[in-house]
Regions:
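Cell-wall glycan-active module
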Residues: 11-390
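Bacterial N-terminal signal peptides
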Residues: 2-9
Length: 390
């Protein structure tokens, strides 16, 4: 019987031992961790460790991940980093952040901005005595902001469709796709998982019962935030030799660490300076690839002219469209780059490297980097996995 191993167990080299000249020996599968054993891995200062451990155990089981120490510690480390074990974290200055976002929208509408926004914010949801403006000034948590903007859109779409349509079109005249883009909450919950990812995951695994509103509501609960966060962290194959690269991917996007290594090697081979951001294509605000060539795509084209003339521009674009999947590694473009890199760069032709991405957010004080995030989470992870059994 083969033992099912988590991606993290594989990355850490666990699972099999072998003596010289003998057939591979299969290590027996460890017993799944219990909720109480997971609780012992959570930092002592965390309130309600039993509740958090139950949420983690249920999330791993629901997503069909092994209930082992590497998986549990990875989730624990991200929760500790992202929210300090708070299902609905408060955001300092959130009211000012949301108001500034609305003011930028208003300013781009010129003379129409003030009267339009005044009408929008003067209304109120049927189940709340406060106006939208009053609620805006009292925002404290992510859920407060999320519900405000969702209530505002729902109220005007149903009760004042003409005003709603005007505001929607006004949004499209700015840099917004619509009023929904005024909502500053794009990551949510204890693991700060991407709302877009959570909605996609829910559609794929929960079907028609998963509406955007229900997914957002779930993210602000302890079970829901951990369920979607664990899925985002662990539910994709990546043969990294160190788990820190998976933590970087959590911050910068699927396979960002692998793709950053590709960019680094392309830069050396093509002579073009590239930002190692883990994106081989450029993307719009909704995550769709742009039509124009990115700097990395142009570097691949320059590489192909010199080393792989069989790669056409069409082949390169087709292959790069799969850069967020494991399947990218089977493409002509990836194989050509890695083959030449191995020949020309030797030890520098690594599989993964930490992306160099500046991370700024209305919810962060100052600017951080993906490397800083990954290293900070990894320190928490290493402490967790080294925790003695109790």
């Amino acid at each position: 019987m083969l033992v099912a191993l988590s991606p993290l167990a594989l990355a850490s080299g666990c699972g099999a031992t072998r003596r010289a000249g003998s057939a591979p020996a299969q290590t027996p599968a460890p017993a799944p961790l219990t909720a109480s054993e997971i609780a012992a891995l959570i930092p002592r200062q965390v309130r309600d460790r039993d509740g958090w451990s139950e949420a983690i155990a249920n999330a791993l089981a629901a997503n069909e991940f092994p209930l082992d120490r590497p998986s549990a510690c990875a989730v624990i480390a991200v929760i500790a980093q992202e929210s300090g074990f708070d299902a609905d974290p408060a955001v300092p200055g959130l009211a000012a952040i949301a108001a500034a976002r609305i003011d930028r929208y208003k300013a781009k509408l010129g003379p129409f901005g003030d009267p339009l926004l005044e009408r929008l914010l003067s209304g109120r949801a049927p189940d709340d005595a406060r106006s939208f403006r009053e609620r805006l000034t009292r925002l404290r948590t992510e859920r407060d902001a999320d519900l405000l903007f969702r209530d505002l859109l729902a109220y005007y779409e149903v009760n004042h469709p003409a005003l709603f349509t005007a505001a929607q079109w006004a949004g499209k005249l700015t840099d917004l796709d619509g009023l929904a883009d005024l909502n500053p909450i794009t990551t949510a919950g204890s693991m700060q998982v991407s709302v877009r990812f959570a909605e996609q995951w829910a559609r794929a695994h929960k079907g028609k019962t998963a509406t955007p509103g229900s997914v957002r509501d779930a993210l602000y609960t302890r079970p829901g935030g951990v369920y979607y966060g664990a899925a985002r962290l662990l539910a994709y194959p990546a043969p990294y030799d160190r788990v820190i690269f998976r933590f970087a991917d959590y911050n910068a996007g699927f396979y960002a660490s692998r793709n950053a290594a590709v960019q680094e090697q392309l830069s050396r081979l093509s002579g073009r300076k590239l930002t190692l951001d883990g994106d081989l294509l450029s993307y719009d605000r909704n995550g769709n690839p742009n039509d124009q060539d990115s700097e990395s795509e142009r570097a691949v084209q320059a590489f192909a002219q010199r080393y792989a003339p069989q790669l056409s521009a069409g082949t390169i674009r087709r292959d790069l469209l799969g850069e967020k999947t494991i399947g990218f590694e089977g493409t002509e473009t990836y194989r050509a780059i890695k083959t030449v890199a191995a020949q020309k760069l030797g030890r520098l032709a690594v599989y993964a490297t930490l992306p160099q991405v500046a991370v700024s957010s209305p919810k962060l004080k100052g600017t951080r980097s993906t490397a800083w995030f990954a290293q900070s989470v990894d320190r928490r992870y290493q402490t967790c996995v080294a925790t003695p059994a109790r």
